[in-house]
Structures are given as structure tokens and as C-alpha cells.
A protein has these predicted regions:
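Active-site phosphate/pyrophosphate-binding segments
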Residues: 144-152
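Short acidic, Gly/Ser-rich segments with clustered Asp/Glu that frequently serve as metal-coordination loops
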Residues: 52-53
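N- or domain-start disorder-to-order transition segments that initiate the globular core
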Residues: 2-36
Length: 160
């Protein structure tokens, strides 16, 4: 069975960022810009595991990371690494939450997009931290562009 893939606009409308979270993201993005343009002498640290597969574990980790980030905020700007993709160069293997939200089930891109939007939104709400994620396919960016503060396009040769 072939399912129609919702547009990024449809997904964002179904799983929106509220105004408070939009303001948090705008503030953090402005701080990142200041760091990259030299207006701030802070150091950016993108910190976290290489894979975010289970929401509860991710949120537990992020709550602890937020406490550390608060202690060092005058010198270091922490961006949590919430990598929901596991890019593979040859196409086989587990590709992360985006493509397979439950590692025990079959791949489901639509449910994956919904799951990672919900997780990223919950992470911002609970910690005040906007995240970095990685992607292999540029077409996936519009589904998360209103949530993420940092994106890395990568290719992982783990299956080669």
C-alpha cells in the first residue's frame, strides 16, 4: 500500500511550535548568529550521542545536559545533538527515528516525521534548548526547519 506523504506545511500545521517555543528558538538562533559573526566570544558546543532513538532516554539526557549548559552559559553555548537519522551510503540498515520511529517495526517515514517533530518540540519545552540534527536527504529539512537551530548534512559509511 502506498501512502501519500504529507507536505511539510501539513506536518507543521498538525504538529506546530507554539509562540513561546518560537520565541525560545528565535532567541537561541540570534545567539548562534552572534557567535558565528564574532559579536559574542562564546564557544559553541554541539553535544550528544550519535543516535536519538527513544524519546524518554533523549529527554532524560537533555534535562541533565540543560543543567550543565546553565552552569557554563557565560562561556559556552550548548546545542544538544539530537540525531534522529542514521544516514547510510548504501541504503541498508536502521536509518533512525525519521524513517523508522520504532526500531522493532517496519520503516514509516510519515510516522517518523511526526515522532521527531514531537520529540524536538518536547525537548525545547522541557529544557529550553534547541537542537542540532543530521540528515542525508535535503528534502527532509522543510519538515523541521522551524524547530532546529543547527543541521548537518552527512553521509555515514557504516554499511560500507
Amino acid at each position: 500500500m502506498v501512502k501519500a506523504v504529507p507536505t511539510p506545511e501539513e506536518i507543521r500545521a498538525a504538529h506546530p511550535m507554539d509562540k513561546e517555543l518560537q520565541e525560545i528558538k528565535a532567541k537561541r538562533d540570534a545567539e548562534i548568529k552572534k557567535i558565528f559573526t564574532g559579536e559574542s566570544d562564546k564557544f559553541i558546543a554541539i553535544i550528544g550521542p550519535c543516535s536519538a532513538d527513544y524519546e524518554n532516554s533523549v529527554l532524560d539526557y537533555l534535562c541533565r545536559l540543560a543543567a550543565v549548559a546553565e552552569k557554563i552559559k557565560d562561556k559556552v553555548f550548548v546545542i544538544p545533538r539530537i540525531y534522529t537519522n542514521k544516514p547510510r551510503t548504501n541504503g541498508s540498515g536502521y536509518k533512525g527515528m525519521l524513517h523508522q520511529p520504532n526500531p522493532e517495526d517496519k520503516p514509516d517515514f510519515i510516522e517518523g516525521v511526526k515522532a521527531i517533530r514531537k520529540m524536538h518540540i518536547k525537548a525545547i519545552r522541557e529544557t529550553g534548548l534547541t537542537a542540532a540534527d543530521e540528515m542525508l536527504y535535503t528534502d527532509n529539512w522543510p519538515y523541521l526547519e522551524d524547530i532546529l537551530s543547527c543541521l548537518l548534512y552527512t553521509s555515514d559509511a557504516a554499511d560500507d
